[in-house]
From Swiss-Prot:
Subcellular location per the Swiss-Prot or TrEMBL entry: Cytoplasm
GO cellular component, one term: cytoplasm
Similarity-based family: Belongs to the DapB family.
Native species: Methanothermobacter thermautotrophicus (strain ATCC 29096 / DSM 1053 / JCM 10044 / NBRC 100330 / Delta H) (Methanobacterium thermoautotrophicum)
Name of the featured protein: 4-hydroxy-tetrahydrodipicolinate reductase
Residues the record marks as active site: 160, 164
Keyword Membrane in annotation: no
Length: 273
């Protein structure tokens, strides 16, 4: 039985993950953790997620170390915001708890802190900006295509619901990185985030990145390879959060096979790296 703790337990992703964990025969939900000061503290998480009483009360992230010591999870799943996730990862690695992290928006400095914590502690970790199986096949297709279409102009367009807090999405950033790495470019040097005014002629190396926000869009990602006389579009559309949650469940099951002290991603989980 895999003992699972979830931070961001009452968020869109967190509550969906909890509902799914409660359905899995080889998993046990042992902790549901929310932001400090949450008014839901002490409430049974099953009641919040529509499952009735499950015997797991919502706890406050300010007491995370105590919660981990009391509940002894095998893995902690984090879908929060970057600043909170860094502190969660610090505490979890100190406690020797493995990690599945889908939080996005980390700065380079924050990501280095995360790497240092995982390497120093030797815990197992899967960290991915998007855990949907289809998106990770999408990344593989981009990796394979980019060198073949290296003389084509590349534009990345992502669209999400109005409530999404970071832009561009972690998935769009990862697509940028995949294409840049596959074509010998440095993502930070070639990315152009939106365009306005007299921008002049497009350079051959630049990669445009554009974010759309509106309505209840779960997540659309389009990579456009534009050449002379033709264009190729690689598209992934998420119809519901079930796509992401299914990937999280696979990552939880994979974690014991992950390499200690090294960040692995969904490509490793799916065996396509």
């Amino acid at each position: 039985m895999i003992r699972v703790a979830v931070t961001g337990a009452c968020g869109r992703m967190g509550s969906g993950i909890i509902r799914r964990v409660l359905e899995e025969e080889d998993m046990e939900l042992v902790a549901a953790i929310e932001a400090p000061g949450t008014p839901l503290r002490g409430r049974d998480i099953g009641e919040f997620t529509g499952r009735g009483s499950v015997g797991v009360e919502v706890t406050d992230a300010s007491n995370l170390a105590d919660t981990l010591a009391e509940t002894e999870p095998d893995v902690l799943v984090d879908f929060t915001v970057a600043s909170a996730a860094v502190e969660t990862i610090k505490t979890s690695t100190e406690a020797g708890v493995n990690l599945v992290v889908g939080t996005t928006g980390f700065s380079e400095e924050e990501m280095q802190t995360v790497r240092d914590c995982i390497e120093r502690s030797g815990v197992r970790a899967v960290i991915a900006p998007n855990m949907a199986v289809g998106v990770n096949v999408f990344f593989k297709v981009l990796r394979d295509l980019a060198p073949i279409l290296s003389d084509y102009d590349v534009e990345i367009i992502e669209a999400h619901h109005r409530h999404k807090k970071d832009a561009p999405s972690g998935t769009a950033v990862r697509a940028l990185e995949v294409i840049s790495e596959a074509t010998g470019r440095r993502a930070s040097e070639v990315a152009v985030h939106g365009r306005s005014g007299l921008t002049g002629e497009r350079s051959r190396d630049e990669i445009g990145v554009h974010a759309v926000r509106g309505g209840d869009i779960v997540g659309d990602h389009i990579v456009l390879f534009a050449g002379d006389g033709e264009r190729l579009e690689i598209v992934h559309r998420a119809h519901s959060r079930d796509a992401f949650i299914g990937g999280v469940i696979r990552a939880i099951r994979f974690i014991e096979d992950a390499e200690p002290g090294r960040i692995m991603d969904m490509g490793d989980v799916l065996g396509i790296n």
